[in-house]
Amino acid sequence: MKYEKLLPRFLEYVKVNTRSDENSTTTPSTQALVEFAHKMGEDMKALGLKDVHYLESNGYVIGTIPANTDKKVRKIGLLAHLDTADFNAEGVNPQILENYDGESVIQLGDTEFTLDPKDFPNLKNYKGQTLVHTDGTTLLGSDDKSGVAEIMTLADYLLNINPDFEHGEIRVGFGPDEEIGVGADKFDVADFDVDFAYTVDGGPLGELQYETFSAAGAVIEFQGKNVHPGTAKNMMVNALQLAIDYHNALPEFDRPEKTEGREGFFHLLKLDGTPEEARAQYIIRDHEEGKFNERKALMQEIADKMNAELGQNRVKPVIKDQYYNMAQIIEKDMSIIDIAKKAMENLDIAPIIEPIRGGTDGSKISFMGLPTPNLFAGGENMHGRFEFVSVQTMEKAVDTLLEIIRLNNEVAK
């Protein structure tokens, strides 16, 4: 194995349950995330990182790999998130499959679940590689503990294995609650103090992402008028029916299951209620600013039209922006994309530069003034029991970070 401690680190990290809690009012959202951040801080100190500190204000643990060159080069930040998605993360029991043949069905522990190339054709890309997968009862946590392990392995390499590898100052940060969309809300750009950064939070080999969705959330309250159904004619207003009518007024094909690429959507996350009152929760996504604003306006227009027809204000939307397409920031200086692309090409990795149908912590951090695109970390089928990662892809992620650092030495600050 190229980096001896990369896999052991990853296996250690994924066994810790750091599932974030969207219903929490604290930062981080769970005590487990606080404890894991402190554990990472101790590990960072053990590797030799300097100025390691935990920020109570946002749950991030930060450390520094000091420069070992006199060149005036740009300071690089590397970020990954410690939390995992909303799927069972208790008792993660990673399974290791060496020299996968690229075609066999992989049994997930003792469960009835399998990784079948017929269902997951991406498996065919991993012939001859070592895969880490789940036992079928939990997620794996490669999102984003692959990124955490890769950054820690990079730090170990620079500080202990090959301390003569020339580099400028590198700052490392691990934070909470990315999966519930609030992890970067309180990120401290001034404390991190770098010229540019990358989140190591992408998927398969070669992913390089700087264009995200712009995102908003919408909560629609429906006020009905409930009377006995036997005498309801011309009197009852069923709030649940209002919710159905509202949803049906949205474009039928603008849904996640019917869109791809640069196409945006409305996604109904939750609908509950009674004839008296109901509540629908949506997310709104689009890459283009104009279309994003049009989607938000449409949700208000539908409510206004329904209220006019009802003669009463019974449909009440509240729409709040969540994050914006970070391409608006990064396209002002594409050098950090160019250097990452060049690093991959130097390593015979084909860069995959496509819009993210989602967001990253970098979306918010970029709008705070720190351009932060996203690099691959290796995970596939993330957020569930079918998640897996290739050890060789994780190694190439470390290689890519090292090559970015090497190329950065050639760019004067």
Swiss-Prot record:
Transmembrane segments: none annotated. GO terms for cellular component: cytosol. PROSITE patterns: ARGE_DAPE_CPG2_1, ARGE_DAPE_CPG2_2. SUPFAM superfamilies: Bacterial exopeptidase dimerisation domain, Zn-dependent exopeptidases. CDD domains: M20_peptT. Optimum temperature is around 40 degrees Celsius. It is found in: Cytoplasm. It holds the Pfam family M20_dimer. The active site is at residues 83, 178. It comes from the Bacteria. GO terms for molecular function: metallopeptidase activity; tripeptide aminopeptidase activity; zinc ion binding. Zn(2+) 1 binds at residues 81, 143, 201. Its EC number is 3.4.11.4. Its cofactor is Zn(2+). It is an enzyme of class 3 (hydrolase). One of its GO terms (biological process) is peptide metabolic process. Binds 2 Zn(2+) ions per subunit. Belongs to the peptidase M20B family. NCBIfam families: peptidase-T (TIGR01882), PRK05469.1 (NF003976), PRK13381.1 (NF009920). Cleaves the N-terminal amino acid of tripeptides. This is Peptidase T.
